A protein has these predicted regions:
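Generic short beta-strand segments
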Residues: 34, 88-94
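Short, low-complexity N-terminal intrinsically disordered segments enriched in polar/charged residues
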Residues: 1-31, 138-157
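Acidic surface patches and DE-rich sequence motifs
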Residues: 37, 95, 111
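Short beta-strand edge/turn micro-motifs at domain boundaries
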Residues: 104-133
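Residue-level recognition of short loop/turn positions
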Residues: 32, 97, 113-115
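A solvent-exposed, acidic/Ser-Thr-rich amphipathic alpha-helical stretch
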Residues: 23-24, 30-83
Length: 157
């Protein structure tokens, strides 16, 4: 029963993000959390505050306004106070230049009592970097901007 509830919530969160709405993700974060995106590029890095994470999603939507996720598998394990969710997905977008790309990846999410304490986004970084470089060549300065990162909570020090 719990797994079915978590699965429905995960599917709904990805649907919201695919519709340009990161609010449900932000509202689902625990008071202390880490939001991580693999790679050394404009979308990479770790965020530990709602403000930095909100700014990150705003950047994501500016760079990839029609980003969409096709969920291929959702795996859930663990008790309610320490739930691990792994989501295998295929992301598609047209960037701001209209070139359609597809990038596979995985989200790893940790939940404690229904709140997200960790969101790890692990895409095919070659695809992400290629898209960002292409956007930069098309004149999108934000594609090569510094990472949006936040301060570490004492929990992570």
């Amino acid at each position: 029963m719990y797994d079915a509830i978590v699965r429905r919530r995960v599917v709904d969160l990805f649907a919201a993000v695919s519709n340009g709405n990161a609010r449900p993700v932000l509202e689902g974060l625990a008071p202390r959390f880490e939001h991580f995106f693999l790679g050394d590029h404009a979308l990479g890095g770790s965020r530990f505050t709602l403000e930095k994470t909100r700014l990150w999603y705003e950047r994501l939507y500016r760079l990839l306004p029609d980003i969409s996720f096709d969920l291929r598998a959702v795996r859930i394990s663990g008790p309610r106070w320490n739930t691990l969710v792994a989501v295998d997905w295929l992301e598609s977008n047209s960037g701001t230049d209209g070139v359609r790309t597809f990038t596979p990846g995985v989200h790893v999410v940790r939940l404690a009592w229904g709140r997200m304490t960790y969101i790890g986004i692990y895409p095919d970084t070659v695809g992400v970097v290629t898209t960002l470089q292409r956007l930069s060549r098309a004149g999108v300065a934000e594609a090569t901007a510094e990472k949006i990162q936040g301060q570490l909570h004492s929990r992570y020090r």
